[in-house]
Amino acid sequence: MSCEILRKLEEVIRRRIEEKNPESYTYRLYSSGIHNVARKVGEEAVEVAVAALAEGKSRIVEEAADLLYHLLVLLNSTGLSLGDVCAELERRMR
């Protein structure tokens, strides 16, 4: 299974940040600063862990999707991309 949806999501995130629409959650999160974005990633990671320990599979999937979204916003906020992470994973597999 390909995860092309992550690349599409990354593009949507980039576009929403560029549009600077104050009604966009993505833009508001991004413009709140790296500390808030990082805090949100931490919160979502904890929610994935809690779901894994005490909730069903569907809840784990939902929380993991939230974590991936917020991680992509974090990467964008630091000038990185999903491609950078994929390159590192490929390097580690050698």
UniProtKB/Swiss-Prot annotation:
The cross-references to SUPFAM superfamilies, in alphabetical order and at most eight, read:
all-alpha NTP pyrophosphatases
Q: Which InterPro entries match?
A: HisE (IPR008179), PRib-ATP_PPHydrolase-like (IPR021130)
**Is this entry keyworded Cytoplasm?**
yes
Q: Which reaction does it catalyse?
A: 1-(5-phospho-beta-D-ribosyl)-ATP + H2O = 1-(5-phospho-beta-D-ribosyl)-5'-AMP + diphosphate + H(+)
Q: What is its EC number?
A: 3.6.1.31
Enzyme class, first EC level, given as a word: hydrolase
Q: For this chain's UniProt record, which GO biological process terms are given?
A: L-histidine biosynthetic process
From the Swiss-Prot or TrEMBL record, state where the protein is found. Answer: Cytoplasm
MF annotations from Gene Ontology: ATP binding; phosphoribosyl-ATP diphosphatase activity
- What pathway does the annotation place this protein in? Amino-acid biosynthesis; L-histidine biosynthesis; L-histidine from 5-phospho-alpha-D-ribose 1-diphosphate: step 2/9
| A GO CC term assigned to this protein in UniProt | cytoplasm
Name one matching Pfam family: PRA-PH
Transmembrane stretches in the record are none
Q: Which UniProt keywords apply?
A: Amino-acid biosynthesis, ATP-binding, Cytoplasm, Histidine biosynthesis, Hydrolase, Nucleotide-binding
Q: Where is this protein chiefly located?
A: cytoplasm
NCBIfam families associated with the record: histidine_hisI (TIGR03188)
As for family, the record states: Belongs to the PRA-PH family.
Q: What is this protein called?
A: Phosphoribosyl-ATP pyrophosphatase
Q: What is the lineage of its organism?
A: Archaea, Thermoproteota, Thermoprotei, Thermoproteales, Thermoproteaceae
